[in-house]
From Swiss-Prot:
It is found in: Cytoplasm. The keyword Mitochondrion does not apply. The lineage of its organism: Bacteria, Pseudomonadati, Pseudomonadota, Gammaproteobacteria, Enterobacterales. Specifically methylates the adenine in position 37 of tRNA(1)(Val) (anticodon cmo5UAC). CDD domains: AdoMet_MTases. This is tRNA1(Val) (adenine(37)-N6)-methyltransferase. One of its GO terms (biological process) is methylation. One of its GO terms (molecular function) is nucleic acid binding. It catalyses: adenosine(37) in tRNA1(Val) + S-adenosyl-L-methionine = N(6)-methyladenosine(37) in tRNA1(Val) + S-adenosyl-L-homocysteine + H(+). It comes from Escherichia coli O157:H7.
Length: 245
């Protein structure tokens, strides 16, 4: 896919090595997903799982960041989104490495014998509240179809002993998610608090949990500098993906 043609495509987001159409997905490509896909630790991974794949963004980002031997499974409950994810994968350089499954993750994990050393999810985080325009968007935004305890349980069922389970969440919800994970036997190993600029409090948090205990490394990421341009740290993290960075 050449940049000269892909940059003109609509109803999606053009990255340096792939295009993500998202017009049939409830949740669109956004900063949260891009942060998570660029941040998740991939060193030494052999098999990855994307829970709630949506458009396939995270699976595609992981494919770009990992070697040709790494297999990625992407599970999406909503059929229209799963179909679009399959189409996005088919048009990418990594068709042979990414498997998109239209399935309920709770049922899907019970059928798996393989274990994953990296599991990634940009999960729903709102409790039932303001009505959404469509049932698909409600499913993507609210925890009614996949609450956080169920998500943590599903990840625990198919992760390797030294694997990482990575999520991105709003700051306060991330704190309660961490408390829940610790109570279920997970160990927090990586935490990055994300702020829009130096003057603002963090609004998102990137979290990596593991079944294996170990030191927790924490840091802070500022997206924009005083000049409102992307910060050096954010640029370093995401420049392999953004088309004009």
């Amino acid at each position: 896919m050449s940049q000269s043609t892909s940059v003109l495509r609509r109803n999606g987001f053009t990255f340096k090595q792939f295009f993500v159409a998202h017009d049939r997905c409830a949740m669109k490509v956004g900063t949260d997903g891009i942060l998570l896909g660029a941040w998740a630790p991939v060193a030494g991974v052999k098999r990855c799982l994307d829970i709630g794949a949506g458009s396939g963004l995270l699976a595609l980002m992981l494919a770009q960041r990992t070697s040709d031997s790494v297999i990625i499974d992407a599970v999406e409950l909503e059929s229209e989104a799963a179909t679009q994810a399959q189409e996005n994968v088919a048009q990418s350089p990594w068709l042979e490495r990414i498997n998109v499954h239209t399935a309920d993750i709770q049922q899907w994990v019970t059928q798996q014998t393989a274990r994953f050393d990296l599991i990634i999810s940009n999960p729903p985080y709102y409790e039932q509240g303001v009505e959404c325009a469509t049932p698909q968007r409600e499913q993507a935004r609210y925890t009614t179809s996949l609450d956080h305890q169920t998500l943590l349980t599903c990840a625990a069922e198919c992760i390797t002993e030294e694997g990482f389970f990575c999520v991105v969440l709003p700051e306060q919800i991330g704190n309660s998610f961490t408390e829940l994970a610790l109570s279920m036997g997970w160990h927090l190993r990586l935490r990055t608090d994300v702020a829009e600029n130096e003057a603002r409090l963090p609004h998102r948090v990137l979290l990596a949990f593991s079944p294996q205990a170990g030191e927790c490394f924490s840091d802070r990421l500022v997206i924009r500098g005083p000049d409102q341009n992307y910060s050096e740290a954010y640029t370093a993290l995401t420049q392999a993906f953004y088309l004009f960075m």
